[in-house]
Amino acid sequence: MLDMGQDRPIDGSGAPGADDTRVEVQPPAQWVLDLIEASPIASVVSDPRLADNPLIAINQAFTDLTGYSEEECVGRNCRFLAGSGTEPWLTDKIRQGVREHKPVLVEILNYKKDGTPFRNAVLVAPIYDDDDELLYFLGSQVEVDDDQPNMGMARRERAAEMLKTLSPRQLEVTTLVASGLRNKEVAARLGLSEKTVKMHRGLVMEKLNLKTSADLVRIAVEAGI
């Protein structure tokens, strides 16, 4: 993932990690860590209320994929994954999603800490509070094999098939969760109790064999909902 800021240009020098602009961030709440910590998918959370939308949390899978430690990432915008080959039109698509507070999924060229380029299937999605105010952005990354150009399509088809196993109510809950709403707001939108929403989310996670809400959001966006 890269450049979840507004319109600040990426470094573009071809030297991964060259942009070391950093802001001070406070430790995130436990529920933010719970969102991504156990996910096998490389995931991060950023705070758009702070200057330059810096990362406030990453998981171990992100370190395993990119080579960057938590200490090297927190407080920085994700543009440090960009380099000379990063496609500017795809960067613009991510920025547009951030500006409009809409989920966006692109396959973009990024660079690991050691300079290795990789095709990155990047998801960026908003997270709202109970008053429908933007809190954070969730980002997740999956390395795509350039030798398998249809891999992205296969993931989308698989995600769509997974969602077909859900009941209509479970699909409604999943759709609202993927849009960034938390349980209280989902409950209000559907006229359900918060306890019932939590029950449906739990059943969805179990049925789809997912570990975290971040994984659920990615599946939903990949499926096109």
From Swiss-Prot:
Keyword Hydrolase attributed: no
Positions that bind FMN: 77-79, 95, 110, 141
DNA-binding region boundaries: 183-202
Entries under Gene3D superfamilies matching the protein: PAS domain, Winged helix-like DNA-binding domain superfamily/Winged helix DNA-binding domain
Region annotation Disordered: where it falls in the sequence: 1-23
Segments forming domain PAC: 102-156
Basic and acidic residues: bias regions: 1-10
SMART domains in the record: HTH_LUXR, PAC, PAS
NCBIfam families, alphabetized: sensory_box
Record protein name field: Light-activated DNA-binding protein EL222
Native organism taxonomy: Bacteria, Pseudomonadati, Pseudomonadota, Alphaproteobacteria, Sphingomonadales
